[in-house]
C-alpha cells in the first residue's frame, strides 16, 4: 500500500490508502516456446504460473507463415487462459495484426468472449522490438488483463 494526501476540503484524516499493483495477485507469463519444423509447420506452447505454484498451459499449431505464426502464438495463449479459468469465458481469437507505426512494430489482437460478464470483444496491443511471435502472446494477455483481474478477484 502507499498513501496519498487527502484533499484539503476533506473532513476525514490526512491520507488515503491506495492498493499498489504489487498487492494484486496476477498470472505470470512464465514460459513461451515457438518452433518451426522442416515441413513448414509451427507450434507454440505458453505457460502461465499462479502464485500458489500451479501452472496453466496451452498449445497450438498450424502451417507456418508470418501471419499464421502470430495467430498460433495468440491461440496458444488463449488455450492457457481457458485452462486457467476452466473455460469460464470461452475466449476466441477474432484476429491478429502486425502493424508498423511511430517507427515501431505493434501487434494488435482482437478477442471475443463466448460467455461470462463484461464486454464481449477485447482488444490488446504490444509494442515489439524483435520477437513478433512472443509479442502476439503478450498482446493477448494485455487484451484479457481486466477480465482476468475480475475473475481472480472473485475466486
Over which residues does each language-model region extend?
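Intrinsically disordered, low-complexity regions
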Residues: 1-12, 47-55, 59, 151-155
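Extended amphipathic alpha-helical scaffolds
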Residues: 2-35
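Short amphipathic beta-strand and strand-loop transition segments with alternating hydrophobic
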Residues: 30-36, 94-99
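Short beta-strand elements
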Residues: 33-56, 105-118
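Conserved active-site and cofactor/substrate-binding residues in soluble primary-metabolism enzymes
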Residues: 39-41, 68, 72, 131, ...
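Acidic (E/D-rich), amphipathic helical modules within compact regulatory domains
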Residues: 48, 56-79
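Mixed-charge, glycine-accented linear interaction segment located at domain edges/termini
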Residues: 57-59, 115-155
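Short, solvent-exposed interaction modules
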Residues: 78-132
